[in-house]
């Protein structure tokens, strides 16, 4: 298991989480570092069967011109804006995905419709068939934000470029401080994901 996190407290929480789930220390390859400014060392494993990301939403980053020559971003001709690093994180994860791998990243809804550089990146991802599914989540689901978020599922190489949209925004139990998705809600979403078809008021399979 490999991972990288800039915030030291979150980094230590990730290590504790792995210990609690029985992952031996020798199988933990976690780094306390900047994912965007300091990419994974090339002397270690650099592509993975599965990539999971929950980056800070709309975080600031340098977006320095030199990143246009960075292999993670160079194919897109533009960079994620300085004020919103969402697509920088997404492209970082996609770059490190194996050709037959799957990636899932949690991001704010804004990544689905914002224009300018983000729109160009999104268009290339769609035309390349990289975006496999978009799952809209309920608002107030996470501790750090009350805004609605989505899970974007990506594939590096696949036949076709259709995209499955799942509306899970109403699949939650309301709590005092946070909303909660139960195992039943998650099972319903996974069934829709597995079927990969249009279901009225639940999911839509879009092709272009």
Residue ranges and their predicted role:
Residues 9-45:
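S-adenosyl-L-methionine
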Residues 1-5:
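Conserved SAM-binding motif I beta-strand of class I
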Residues 37-38, 43-208:
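A conserved structural/catalytic subdomain of Rossmann-like adenosyl-cofactor enzymes
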């Amino acid at each position: 298991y490999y991972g990288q996190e800039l915030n030291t407290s979150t980094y230590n929480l990730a290590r504790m989480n792995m210990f609690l789930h029985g992952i031996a220390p020798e199988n933990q390859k976690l780094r306390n570092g900047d994912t965007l400014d300091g990419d994974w060392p090339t002397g270690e494993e650099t592509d993975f069967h599965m990539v999971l990301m929950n980056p800070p939403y709309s975080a600031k980053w340098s977006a320095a011109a030199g990143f246009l020559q960075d292999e993670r971003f160079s194919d897109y001709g533009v960079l994620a804006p300085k004020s919103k690093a969402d697509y920088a994180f997404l492209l970082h994860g996609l770059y490190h995905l194996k050709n037959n791998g799957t990636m899932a990243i949690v991001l704010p809804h804004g990544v689905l419709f914002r224009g300018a550089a983000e729109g160009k990146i999104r268009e290339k991802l769609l035309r390349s068939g990289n975006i496999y599914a978009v799952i809209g989540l309920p608002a107030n689901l996470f501790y750090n934000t009350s805004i609605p978020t989505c899970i974007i599922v990506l594939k590096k190489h696949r036949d076709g470029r259709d995209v499955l949209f799942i509306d899970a925004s109403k699949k939650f139990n309301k709590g005092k401080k946070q909303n909660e998705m139960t195992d039943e809600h998650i099972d319903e979403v996974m069934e829709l994901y597995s079927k990969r078809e249009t279901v009225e008021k639940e999911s839509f399979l879009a092709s272009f």
